[in-house]
């Protein structure tokens, strides 16, 4: 089911080019890295494209073609699609623009493309899109740089914004499992793709950038089922009246009032993000298990960030855990007299890796704690190593191993880089701002409610 888009046995790039100024050049160059099957360039004029034997038509290709990427001028798209059908292609990504987004005539032409595709049993992503990626299969069927490998599937209705977010995540060392630019959604839409992604192994969460949904009822129906299996996070553009009008003119889809969308998301268990950063923060949280409740313990080596995080937690309707007396006494037994041993636990700036280990272990073992947020702000000094605090947290998590989620907030900018890398490698999502880690904790709690995790509070 739609797997031929993301793990195809053969790919044709129709409009593959030797001219670096053309999109077909970039798409083919990126796809040459794919190892899951053969990649064939199709170009009516060239014998070879980028050193690979080219074919005049997709029908001339000797091998099997599961997926075709169409990046030819608009006037050739229809005929190309018919040839794909005759060849037995299963999935088609149409990058070419100039269809439904241009008005009534374009919408009519787009409808015709879908009719042709369905006649041959093909499905379409696009038109007017950037393409698709599956980082777990080394598949980059776009004209942009491939995303880093991760476990969030990101579906974007805006190609340019989607590309911008991919570039942002590369810089911030955040990974995607899949990137799908849906364009005009003439055929496959959010609901179809969510349905497919619900059962994949490598996609732990699904993030959506939405401007407008064509079939609201089906979206709700599918989302209700999908959110019971894995989290869906939506960033909806066009909340204001002017934004809504802009969204409608951009993709040619119905934007609809934000109130309607908000109700639909709530009804179907979709988590709502208000910004790009919030969407990414929420989506990244799901390398962690889901919590049993909404009580959060905070440990920190500086007072300020602990208080700021407590404020953000409160804003989200989560609770600061009341630590057991036994936990408080044990913390007091090894932390300095100036340390604050009630939640948030402020171990003060002198805290070493061992203190992080012992504190994290006690907090995770406390039955009143559902989620742990471990904060490290103070840059290393007095002989501390750059990763000792992170190592302490990881050691505690591995030893206690009781299925409670742990999130990290490392705020010392470039000084924290190595520690953050180590935490992420061990599946602990690491953030730089209190509001981001709070968004992540909130997302975990909400998703636990979706799957019926019996969340208290």
Swiss-Prot record:
Keywords: ATP-binding, Ligase, Nucleotide-binding. The keyword rRNA processing does not apply. It catalyses: acetate + ATP + CoA = acetyl-CoA + ADP + phosphate. SUPFAM superfamilies: NAD(P)-binding Rossmann-fold domains (SSF51735), Succinyl-CoA synthetase domains (SSF52210). One of its GO terms (molecular function) is ATP binding. Its EC number is 6.2.1.13. InterPro entries: AcCoA-synth-alpha, Acyl-CoA_Synth/Transferase, CoA-bd, Ligase_CoA_dom, NAD(P)-bd_dom_sf, Succ_CoA_lig_flav_dom, Succinyl-CoA_synth-like. The keyword Manganese does not apply. It comes from the Archaea. Pfam families: CoA_binding_2 (PF13380), Ligase_CoA_2 (PF19045), Succ_CoA_lig (PF13607). Optimum temperature is above 90 degrees Celsius (at pH 8.0). PANTHER family: ACETATE--COA LIGASE [ADP-FORMING]. Belongs to the acetate CoA ligase alpha subunit family. Catalyzes the reversible formation of acetate and ATP from acetyl-CoA by using ADP and phosphate. Can use other substrates such as phenylacetyl-CoA, indoleacetyl-CoA and isobutyryl-CoA, but not succinyl-CoA. Seems to be involved primarily in the degradation of aryl-CoA esters to the corresponding acids. Participates in the conversion of acetyl-CoA to acetate and in the degradation of branched-chain amino acids via branched-chain-acyl-CoA esters. Heterotetramer of two alpha and two beta subunits. NCBIfam families: AcCoA-syn-alpha. This is Acetate--CoA ligase [ADP-forming] II subunit alpha. It comes from Pyrococcus furiosus (strain ATCC 43587 / DSM 3638 / JCM 8422 / Vc1).
């Amino acid at each position: 089911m739609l797997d031929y888009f993301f793990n195809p046995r053969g790919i044709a790039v129709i409009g593959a080019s030797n001219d670096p100024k053309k999109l077909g050049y970039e798409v083919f160059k990126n796809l040459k890295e794919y190892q899951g099957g053969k990649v064939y360039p199709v170009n009516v004029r060239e014998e070879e494209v980028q050193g690979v034997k080219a074919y005049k038509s997709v029908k001339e290709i000797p091998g099997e073609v599961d997926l075709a990427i169409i990046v030819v001028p608009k006037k050739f798209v229809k005929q190309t699609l018919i040839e794909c059908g005759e060849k037995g292609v299963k999935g088609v990504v149409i990058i070419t623009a100039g269809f439904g987004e241009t008005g009534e005539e374009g919408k009519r032409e787009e409808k015709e493309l879908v009719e042709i595709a369905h006649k041959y049993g093909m499905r379409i992503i696009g038109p007017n899109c950037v393409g698709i990626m599956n980082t777990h299969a080394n598949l980059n069927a776009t004209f942009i740089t491939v995303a880093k490998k991760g476990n969030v599937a990101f579906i974007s209705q805006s190609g340019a914004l989607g590309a911008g977010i991919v570039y942002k995540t590369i810089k911030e060392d955040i990974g995607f499992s899949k990137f799908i630019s849906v364009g005009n959604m003439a055929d496959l839409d959010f609901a179809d793709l969510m349905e497919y992604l619900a059962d994949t192994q490598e996609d732990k969460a699904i993030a959506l950038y939405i401007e407008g949904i064509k079939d609201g009822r089906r979206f709700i129906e599918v989302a209700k089922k999908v959110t019971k299996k894995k989290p869906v996070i939506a960033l909806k553009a066009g909340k204001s009246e002017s934004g809504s009008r802009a969204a409608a003119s951009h993709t040619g889809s119905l934007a609809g009032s934000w109130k309607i969308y908000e109700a639909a998301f709530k009804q179907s268990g979709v988590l709502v993000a208000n910004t790009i950063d919030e969407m990414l923060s929420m989506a990244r949280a799901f390398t962690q298990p889901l919590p049993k409740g909404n009580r959060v313990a905070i440990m920190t080596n500086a007072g300020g960030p602990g208080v700021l995080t407590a404020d953000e937690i409160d804003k989200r309707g989560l609770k600061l855990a009341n630590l057991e007396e036994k936990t408080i006494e044990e913390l007091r037994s090894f932390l300095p007299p100036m340390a604050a041993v009630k939640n948030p636990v402020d171990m003060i700036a002198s805290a070493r890796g061992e203190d992080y280990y012992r504190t994290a272990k006690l907090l995770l073992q406390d039955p009143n704690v559902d989620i742990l947020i471990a904060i490290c702000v103070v840059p290393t000094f007095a002989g501390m190593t750059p990763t000792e605090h992170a190592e302490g947290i990881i050691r505690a998590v591995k030893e206690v191993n009781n299925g409670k989620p742990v999130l990290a907030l490392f705020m010392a900018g470039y000084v924290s880089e190595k520690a953050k890398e180590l935490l992420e490698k061990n599946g602990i999502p690491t953030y730089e701002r209190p509001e981001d880690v709070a968004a992540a904790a909130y997302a975990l709690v909400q998703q636990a409610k979706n799957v019926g995790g019996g969340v208290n509070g």
